[in-house]
Swiss-Prot record:
Protein name: Tryptophan synthase beta chain
UniProt gene name: trpB
Assembly behavior: Tetramer of two alpha and two beta chains.
Presence of the UniProt keyword Cytoplasm in the record: no
InterPro entries: Trp_synth_b_CS, Trp_synth_beta, Trp_synth_beta/beta-like, TrpB-like_PALP, TrpB-like_PALP_sf
Length: 397
């Protein structure tokens, strides 16, 4: 099929979907391209971001956790966004696209529940019916978000197949869309999946990096040495990275979930420890068994528990423009506690992975003068029960 935009990032990406979905993807691409050129659409999107979601979000300088080092550390506060995470940005854009295409329903998948909450709030705001697929395990560990979705009128459908996590929810959502695309828009929650989703999601998240660049220049008079973001599918990270890709002096660091440790096999780090394959409509690195089956990923944070990664991240990794590292559950938990106790901010466990790597950079080189920005992609309200149970089991509370 001929596309209006390049469906690949280097060798990664593409449109590996059943033929029945090609017209829906083509319609979506056409709507997106025309919307990007439409001042009325852009004004409506900008208005929602400002007056409904609460943009721009703050860039907060850490006051205490850098003590004894020469690091200056800022947090891009996506946790302050309405809905509690960066997810709200792009769902408002996609919901407006759905209306533009004349759709009346939204289908979504969710892991941590943040994309589900964002999809539910955008659907409620714009008068769209919403059904959300969620792995049964995630329904259990993210009960506050499940209730939030239902409060806003969304139907939450637990998925019991496979590992009962995000990858299975993605499969069910795509299956639903195959039979309902004439009336429904599939609101994919990350910068992955078949073209044009990785491009759409990046463009509807790129204000994160644009604001960060403007704010850091205003506060420090220079660009950061590195911007750091957690990577599951990779939408918050690509939103942060996009405006810095052409700034060679700025390091781009993506942090994958190391789970119980890479050596245990229980992790979610396909970029550095997976193999390229076809999954979820795209060609990208993914966690696979020896015979090519998709392997179960694992992370303490439901939102990073995904066995593949967005194709643009795979490309940035392959050309050496971005560095990808991993952080274990324990390291993320320590960073979570550090930010709570020393800065009075409760971060999402996903974001805690990015913070943990920044703290590692700071502690390994305390004498090094460096300016770092961490994308604090979401707040940790949804994780307090998970953290409580772990700390209680350890006798820390």
């Amino acid at each position: 099929m001929t596309t209006l935009l390049n469906p690949y990032f280097g060798e990664f990406g593409g449109m590996y979907v059943p033929q029945i979905l090609m017209p829906a993807l083509r319609q979506l691409e056409e709507a997106f391209v025309s919307a990007q050129k439409d001042p009325e659409f852009q004004a409506q999107f900008a208005d929602l971001l400002k007056n409904y979601a609460g943009r721009p979000t703050a860039l907060t300088k850490c006051q205490n956790i850098t003590a004894g080092t020469r690091t200056t550390l800022y947090l891009k506060r996506e946790d302050l966004l309405h809905g509690g995470a960066h997810k709200t940005n792009q769902v408002l854009g996609q919901a407006l696209l759905a209306k533009r295409m004349g759709k009346s329903e939204i289908i979504a998948e969710t892991g941590a529940g943040q994309h589900g909450v964002a999809s539910a709030l955008a659907s409620a705001l714009l008068g769209l019916k919403c059904r959300i697929y969620m792995g049964a395990k995630d329904v259990e560990r993210q009960s506050p978000n499940v209730f939030r979705m239902r409060l806003m009128g969304a139907q939450v459908i637990p998925v019991h197949s496979g590992s009962a996590t995000l990858k299975d929810a993605c499969n069910e959502a795509l299956r639903d869309w195959s039979g309902s695309y004439e009336t429904a828009h599939y609101m994919l929650g990350t910068a992955a999946g078949p073209h044009p989703y990785p491009t759409i999601v990046r463009e509807f998240q790129r204000m994160i990096g644009e604001e960060t660049k403007s704010q850091i220049l205003d506060k420090e008079g220079r660009l950061p040495d590195a911007v750091i973001a957690c990577v599951g599918g990779g939408s918050n990270a690509i939103g942060m990275f996009a405006d810095f890709i052409n700034d060679a002096s700025v390091g781009l660091i993506g942090v994958e979930p190391g789970g119980h440790g890479i050596e245990t096999g229980e992790h979610g780090a396909p970029l550095k420890h997976g193999r390229v394959g076809i999954y979820f409509g795209m060609k990208a690195p993914m966690m696979q068994t020896a015979d090519g089956q998709i392997e179960e990923s694992y992370s303490i944070s439901a939102g990073l528990d995904f066995p593949s990664v967005g194709p643009q991240h795979a490309h940035l990794n392959s050309i050496g423009r971005a560095d990808y590292v991993s952080i274990t559950d324990d390291e993320a938990l320590e960073a979570f506690k550090t930010l709570c106790r020393h800065e009075g901010i409760i971060p999402a466990l996903e974001s805690s992975h990015a913070l943990a790597h920044a703290l590692k950079m700071m502690r390994e080189h305390p004498e090094k003068e460096q300016l770092l920005v961490v994308n604090l992609s979401g707040r940790g309200d949804k994780d307090i029960f998970t953290v409580h149970d772990i700390l209680k089991a350890r006798g820390e509370i």
